[in-house]
A protein has these predicted regions:
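Active-site loop/lid in soluble adenylation, ligation, and acyl-transfer enzymes
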Residues: 2-121, 233
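Residues forming anionic-ligand binding surfaces in small-molecule and nucleic-acid pockets
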Residues: 28-37, 117-145
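Short amphipathic alpha-helical segments
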Residues: 45, 49-53, 146-154, 158, ...
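A short glycine-rich, hydrophobically flanked beta-strand micro-motif that places a catalytic Asp/Glu
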Residues: 72-77, 166-182
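Conserved metal-phosphate-binding beta-hairpin within the catalytic cores
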Residues: 93, 173-192
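Phosphate-binding core of ATP-grasp and ATP-grasp-like enzymes
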Residues: 111, 116-128, 159-170, 195-200
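A long amphipathic alpha-helix within ATP-dependent nucleotide-binding catalytic cores
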Residues: 142-174
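C-terminal helix-cap and adjacent tail motif
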Residues: 194-236
Length: 236
């Protein structure tokens, strides 16, 4: 697969076109940002870990019945994926109160919910990704009702799979963010990544944070947390 021109660069990844119009190459960076880009830094080795963790989990999710954009891992940092049109919604699943949820509603972190919650935010940098509901999403023509229903179904399937998989590694899945895309024929697939950048992982016994919160909150040992997640999940 030949990497051609760069067609996009985001906070954590670059995307390149290929000779196949239906495929692109994603290259993961070590750059880290938080608080809507106000805090910036580098987490050494993060790109490679996020790439390999995402590919492993998406491969397993495909087997579990959740379609994804994953095609083939090229190298430790680069992966071939299906070219999709991203649905401009961030889908947040929460199993335990933490982060912005705890702050927004004035509750302590660590409250285990009776059932997972789902939130949507509108992917719009100028508006700082505001929270919206499914009625807003349909009214703004960000997605149809059928697409929203499909996205919700897949998001909860991902949650069930990740909770079980991570529990076997001694990790509690607190919350996480997903993004979905549409292929050329309109099929909804899981896109973006599943990694310590997009999930909150707590050690099941100690509660130690094993994710980007260590960067956000200046907790130290950021690289070590990413490496520990790779060790537990990937055996690396």
């Amino acid at each position: 697969m030949q990497k051609l021109e760069q067609v996009y660069e985001g906070k954590a990844k670059k995307v390149y076109s290929t000779e196949d119009p239906g495929l692109v190459i994603v290259s993961y960076k070590d750059d880290a940002t938080a608080f809507d880009g106000l805090k910036k830094g580098t987490i050494t080795g993060k790109g490679a870990i996020n790439n390999q963790m995402t590919n492993y989990l998406m491969g397993q999710l495909e087997k579990a019945g959740v379609p994804t954009h994953f095609v083939e891992e090229l190298s430790e940092r680069e992966t071939v994926v299906k070219k999709v049109t991203i649905v401009p919604l961030e889908v947040i699943i929460r199993n335990i109160s933490a982060g912005s949820f705890a702050k927004r509603y004035g509750v302590e972190e660590g409250i285990v919910f009776d059932a997972p919650t789902i939130e949507f935010s509108y992917k719009n940098d100028d508006l700082h990704d505001p929270l919206i509901n499914d009625y807003h999403a349909v009214a703004l023509k960000l997605a149809t009702w059928d697409e929203i229903d499909t996205i919700k179904k897949y998001a909860f399937q991902v949650n069930d799979f990740l909770k079980k998989t991570l529990a076997e590694c001694g990790v509690t899945l607190v919350d996480f963010k997903l993004e979905f895309g549409k292929t050329a024929d309109g099929t909804i697939v899981l896109a973006d990544e599943i990694s310590p950048d997009t999930c909150r992982f707590w050690d099941s016994k100690t509660g130690e944070k094993l994710d980007k919160d260590r960067f956000r909150r200046d907790l130290g040992n950021v690289e070590g947390a990413y490496q520990e997640m790779a060790r537990r999940l990937l055996g690396k």
